[in-house]
């Protein structure tokens, strides 16, 4: 991972066409996630983020669960496109699940009442940095990934299936794998509408 930081940010894209292969070993993928979790900042050094890396049959099971959950809420006449989308995630090599440990958040709320309304917000900010960092680190290794949010539909069943503590709040799912098709051209709003410089 010796690329320029800004090159890495530019390279990170939502990649939906991925395969079961991976350009790097599972051990290296796990190490990337471990290093990010260890070093991404968190308010009060609270280290609230939790991750679960699903590979092989565990990865397949996640997307089977998601498919069946969606089947219950998406009209049958509209389901083919949903099925195609979920199968594209299942076609990947693995999935990283991102959680925040709200037992830690609630403990901090009790310790520091002045900031109690902020801790859930800060936890989500940490999670956002975590997701972006894993995603970008994967991109530098030639791994394609995207960020998905099926949490409300699958949270309870995923926790049962993979024995995940109830106090872990699921935030997102990141399927990843070898890139089959690159992302299309990205468009940008005028930078002057988004960045103000005052002197």
Question: Which residues make up each language-model segment?
Answer:
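Short, surface-exposed, charged loop/turn segments at secondary-structure junctions
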Residues: 67-68, 110-118, 188
């Amino acid at each position: 991972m010796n690329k320029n930081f800004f090159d890495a940010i530019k390279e990170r894209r939502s990649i939906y066409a991925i395969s079961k292969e991976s350009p790097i070993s599972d051990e290296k993928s796990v190490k990337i996630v471990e290093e990010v979790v260890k070093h991404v900042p968190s308010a009060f050094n609270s280290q609230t983020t939790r991750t679960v890396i699903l590979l092989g049959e565990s990865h397949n099971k996640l997307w089977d669960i998601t498919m069946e959950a969606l089947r219950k809420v998406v009209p049958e006449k509209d389901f083919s496109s949903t099925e195609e989308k979920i199968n594209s995630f299942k076609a990947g090599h693995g999935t990283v699940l991102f959680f925040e440990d709200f037992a830690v958040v609630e403990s901090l709320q009790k310790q520091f009442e002045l900031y109690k309304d902020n801790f859930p917000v800060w936890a989500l900010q940490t999670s956002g940095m975590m997701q972006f960092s894993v995603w970008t680190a994967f991109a530098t290794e030639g791994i394609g990934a995207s960020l998905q949010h099926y949490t409300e539909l699958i949270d309870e069943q995923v926790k049962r299936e993979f024995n995940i503590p109830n106090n872990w709040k699921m935030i997102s799912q990141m399927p990843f794998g070898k890139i089959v098709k690159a992302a299309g051209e990205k468009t940008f709003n005028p930078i002057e509408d988004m960045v103000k410089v005052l002197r």
